[in-house]
From Swiss-Prot:
Protein name: Elongation factor P-like protein
SUPFAM superfamilies given in the database record: Nucleic acid-binding proteins, Translation proteins SH3-like domain
Stretches assigned to coiled coil: none
Species of provenance: Klebsiella pneumoniae (strain 342)
Cellular component per GO, a single term: cytosol
HAMAP family in the record: EFP (MF_00646)
MF annotations from Gene Ontology: translation elongation factor activity
Family: Belongs to the elongation factor P family.
Pfam families according to UniProt: EFP (PF01132), EFP_N (PF08207), Elong-fact-P_C (PF09285)
UniProt-listed GO biological process terms: peptide biosynthetic process
Length: 190
């Protein structure tokens, strides 16, 4: 079984009799000598959908669950439900808006490549996105000429409604690459 410092976002733990999907990990390094690094993990309970927060020391042993991953394409929206289709056998997977609220900020209209659903024992658990996504800026302050040498940033609204900080020289209509896990600008899209 892995230690807490080996856990990554998207993994599923069996903790206190609950299946918990790791949504976010904050690493807190203590300044005192000999103190253990703390891992504050935010989870979503698979069965109830409730958010759970737990702290672990880096060398704590945790029980992980092996999941089945299937590549999917976004298919359609039906009211409050989002339907994704398996790329191999065309099995539909349905999520409610609440289940994938965070992920929806990064999914452009028409979907994106390399999305996966995670299942365990035939039970649908989560939607996993690739590391990066290319989105179009639909609203930001006008670009400043000669600002490329500056490291100052400004807020920009993407086509999905996501707001992130981008360099000052970018303008409305440009496509940029965003790192999904860190929710940060990486560069212009190809």
């Amino acid at each position: 079984m892995p230690r807490a410092n080996e856990i990554k976002k998207g993994m599923v733990l069996n903790y206190n009799g609950k299946l918990l999907i790791v949504k976010n990990i904050d690493i807190q390094s203590p300044s005192a000598r000999g103190a253990a690094t703390l891992y504050k993990m935010r989870f979503s309970d698979v069965r109830t959908g409730l958010k759970v927060e737990e702290r672990f020391k880096g060398d704590d042993i945790v029980d992980t669950v092996t999941l089945t991953r299937r590549f999917v394409d976004f298919s359609y929206v039906d009211g409050n439900e989002y339907v994704f289709m398996d790329k191999e056998d065309y099995t539909p997977y349905t999520f409610t808006k609440e289940q994938i609220e965070e992920e929806l900020q990064f999914i452009p209209e028409g979907g994106m490549p390399d999305m996966q659903v995670l299942t365990w024992d035939g039970q649908l658990l989560a939607l996993e996105l690739p590391q990066t996504v290319d989105l179009e800026i639909i609203e930001t302050a006008p670009g400043i000429k000669g600002a490329s040498a500056s490291s100052r940033t400004k807020p920009a609204t993407m086509s999905t409604g996501l707001v992130i900080q981008v360099p000052e020289y970018l303008t409305t209509g440009e496509k940029i690459r965003i790192h999904i896990e860190e929710c940060r600008y990486m560069g212009r899209a190809d």
